[in-house]
């Protein structure tokens, strides 16, 4: 469905004479064993992660389609690859959510249930970068007005933290007082995108810190809970 939607939309925009379009990809399009931190040049250089290969191929097809339309028809379709996003209306499914909402749910449930300790996979050393969803929206508008070209742009803050630091921050914000344990025998692989320097040169205003983003998320969550009472 992702492949069909991407190609159909791009084709309609082209036929209607749309000269500017922004295609949002995903960091999962990069090879499974790409050198860290990942660069845009790593795209299509080796095997993809098998667990999300279909989705990755659909996204790759979308950004390459934009590139080919630019080349053949002179359109100005840009491709933006966001880093890990967070914020209101995220997915907190117990088995199908990303790392940040998954951690928030785990520690929230541990707090409610009075769980003495929470065990996390790995050793907590991998690095991750997060971007508040409103910052991505602002950056997308800014890129539409200030960037042209077929080269894919990685969008993010350029600031990273370890999974251990992230876990401790989540526990603090949620109010979990128990022990955090780590199981290094369990696998945990995290990828890190390299943010193009020119993004920082043209970005409009500072990005939100994780602390401030969490505060906004907590305010949204409390308002949502009140509305459901």
Region annotations inferred by a language model:
Residues 1-13:
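Single conserved hydrophobic/aromatic residue that forms the stacking wall/gate
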Residues 10-52, 78:
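Conserved Rossmann-fold NAD(P)-dependent oxidoreductase catalytic core, especially the SDR/UDP-sugar
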Residues 32, 50-83, 102-113:
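Active-site Tyr-X1-5-Lys
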Residues 34, 60, 85-102, 112-116, ...:
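Glycine/proline-rich active-site loop of Rossmann-fold NAD(P)-dependent oxidoreductases
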Residues 123, 151-153, 161-168, 175-192:
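C-terminal "lid/loop" region of Rossmann-like NAD(P)-dependent oxidoreductases
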Residues 133, 152, 186-212:
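Conserved C-terminal active-site "lid" loop/helix of NAD(P)H-dependent oxidoreductases
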Residues 136, 140, 155, 166, ...:
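Non-catalytic, hydrophobic alpha-helical segments
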Residues 197-199, 210-229:
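Amphipathic terminal alpha-helices
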């Amino acid at each position: 469905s992702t492949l069909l939607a991407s190609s159909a939309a791009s084709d309609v925009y082209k036929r209607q004479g749309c000269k500017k379009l922004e295609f949002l990809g995903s960091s999962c399009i990069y090879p499974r064993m790409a050198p860290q931190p990942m660069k845009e040049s790593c795209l299509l250089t080796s095997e993809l992660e098998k667990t999300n290969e279909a989705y990755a191929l659909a996204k790759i097809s979308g950004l390459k389609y934009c590139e080919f339309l630019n080349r053949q028809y002179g359109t100005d379709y840009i491709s933006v690859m966001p880093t890990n996003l967070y914020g209101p209306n995220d997915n907190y499914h117990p088995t199908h959510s990303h790392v940040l909402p998954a951690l928030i749910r785990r520690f929230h449930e541990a707090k409610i249930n009075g769980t003495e300790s929470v065990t996390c996979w790995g050793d907590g050393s991998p690095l991750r970068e997060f971007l508040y969803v409103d910052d991505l929206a602002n950056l997308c508008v800014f890129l539409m007005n200030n960037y042209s070209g077929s080269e894919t742009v990685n969008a993010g803050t350029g600031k990273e933290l370890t999974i251990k630091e992230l876990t401790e921050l989540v526990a603090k914000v949620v109010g979990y007082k128990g022990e955090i344990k780590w199981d290094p025998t369990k696998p945990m692989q995290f990828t890190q995108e390299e943010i193009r320097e020119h993004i920082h040169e043209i970005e409009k205003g500072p990005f939100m810190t994780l602390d401030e983003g969490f505060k906004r998320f907590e305010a949204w969550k409390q308002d949502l809970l009140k509305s459901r009472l």
